[in-house]
Swiss-Prot record:
Component of the cytochrome c oxidase, the last enzyme in the mitochondrial electron transport chain which drives oxidative phosphorylation. The respiratory chain contains 3 multisubunit complexes succinate dehydrogenase (complex II, CII), ubiquinol-cytochrome c oxidoreductase (cytochrome b-c1 complex, complex III, CIII) and cytochrome c oxidase (complex IV, CIV), that cooperate to transfer electrons derived from NADH and succinate to molecular oxygen, creating an electrochemical gradient over the inner membrane that drives transmembrane transport and the ATP synthase. PANTHER family: CYTOCHROME C OXIDASE SUBUNIT 2, CYTOCHROME C OXIDASE, SUBUNIT II. It catalyses: 4 Fe(II)-[cytochrome c] + O2 + 8 H(+)(in) = 4 Fe(III)-[cytochrome c] + 2 H2O + 4 H(+)(out). One of its GO terms (molecular function) is cytochrome-c oxidase activity. This is Cytochrome c oxidase subunit 2. It comes from the Eukaryota. GO terms for biological process: ATP synthesis coupled electron transport. It is a multi-pass membrane protein. NCBIfam families: CoxB. Keywords: Copper, Electron transport, Magnesium, Membrane, Metal-binding, Mitochondrion, Mitochondrion inner membrane, Phosphoprotein, Respiratory chain, Translocase, Transmembrane, Transmembrane helix, Transport.
Length: 227
């Protein structure tokens, strides 16, 4: 999860987030190299007294500054497209959870079970227990098995919302009348926090998301106790 004054991304918990962090580093390095080159050229222009007043064209330079940007764009586009395909691909999910956004709470339905559904509201600050996080704790957590592919179906009952959990690399819009899907896979157990990431009204910032990833045995015991 995030901590105060954090400058980087949250620790990756899913394969998708690991790929996104690698892509971030890859793209950031390209941006750094381009920025360094531009600053170097600007410094040369400001410090050197040599000028070419008679130069009308330079075919070699024009060829380079046409081909080089195209090559850089390809280096960015190829890994980006690969990650996009990975995020859309869902192979044999073991569980499907339907998520509905409301003003201003989330409701969840485990579609593989006959009667396993609940609403998830933020716990008010005056009801928090010691050690709990302000504006992030909920009364009903989403319990899911770790290390298994899970499909999330996401929609909304009223206005636009967005279901986002940064450490899992997830951000999917909840649109009324439309079902979007996302894949959830966690590499380790724990609590993972997120929030609604689309302005949805006056209490937009009071729609936290808490995923509790547990081993499969614990998930089976939890689901049996909830039915």
């Amino acid at each position: 999860m995030a901590y105060p004054f954090q400058l980087g991304l949250q620790d990756a918990t899913s394969p998708i987030m690991e790929e996104l962090m690698n892509f971030h580093d890859h793209t950031l390095m390209i941006v750094f190299l381009i920025s360094s080159l531009v600053l170097y050229i600007i410094s040369l222009m400001l410090t050197t007294k040599l000028t070419h007043t008679s130069t009308m064209d330079a075919q070699e330079v024009e060829t380079i500054w046409t081909i080089l940007p195209a090559a850089i764009l390809i280096l960015i586009a190829l890994p980006s497209l690969r990650i996009l395909y990975m995020m859309d691909e869902i192979n044999n999910p073991v569980l499907t959870v339907k998520t509905m956004g409301h003003q201003w709470y989330w409701s969840y339905e485990y579609t593989d079970y006959e009667d396993l559904c609940f609403d998830s509201y933020m716990i008010p600050t005056n009801e928090l227990k010691p050690g709990e996080l302000r504006l992030l704790e909920v009364d009903n957590r989403v319990v899911l098995p770790m290390e298994l592919p899970i499909r999330m179906l996401i929609s909304s009952e009223d206005v636009l919302h967005s279901w986002a959990v940064p450490s899992l690399g997830l951000k999917t819009d909840a649109i009324p009348g439309r079902l979007n899907q996302a894949t959830v896979t966690s590499n380790r157990p724990g609590l993972f926090y997120g929030q609604c990431s689309e302005i949805c009204g006056s209490n937009h910032s009071f729609m936290p998301i808490v995923l509790e990833m547990v081993p499969l045995k614990y998930f089976e015991n939890w689901s049996a106790s909830m039915i």
